[in-house]
Amino acid sequence: MAITQNYGTGRRKSSTARVFLRKGTGKITVNDRPLDEFFGRETARMIVRQPLELTKNTESFDILVTASGGGTTGQAGAIRLGIARALVEYDETLKSELRKAGFMTRDAREVERKKVGLHKARRATQFSKR
């Protein structure tokens, strides 16, 4: 018998996360490592768990995640979006609740490119009046 699972893709900044949701006990595995080991900061772990806590599903699913690209914050945000999308695939009634909390929205902010003749994207050389 095939294992029933729900899938969700999440992206944030330059990070991508593929999230698989299966019935289970609440284990979250990111790139074959437990969540607590993968993310050193408590903030990142909290971000990942937000959709589950909101829908009261912390102990109902085992979550398998493949995250790539970007840094810690970007990956945490990508995983959060992926979990939210997978939860909606599992139960459509959760969508309005997750949307209201802002977990269904893709954060479209990306790094602005560095411009020629400037130090950074917007930082110009110091201006001297005289």
From Swiss-Prot:
Gene Ontology terms describing biological process: translation
Keyword set for this entry?
A: Ribonucleoprotein, Ribosomal protein
| Short name of one Pfam family | Ribosomal_S9
Residue intervals passing through the bilayer? none
**InterPro entries registered for this protein in UniProt:** Ribosomal_Su5_D2-typ_SF, Ribosomal_uS9, Ribosomal_uS9_bac/plastid, Ribosomal_uS9_CS, Ribsml_uS5_D2-typ_fold_subgr
Q: Which GO terms describe its cellular component?
A: cytosolic small ribosomal subunit
Q: Which GO terms describe its molecular function?
A: RNA binding; structural constituent of ribosome
Family recorded in the similarity comment: Belongs to the universal ribosomal protein uS9 family.
User: What is the protein name for this chain?
Assistant: Small ribosomal subunit protein uS9
Q: Which organism is it from?
A: Xanthomonas oryzae pv. oryzae (strain KACC10331 / KXO85)
- Gene of origin? rpsI
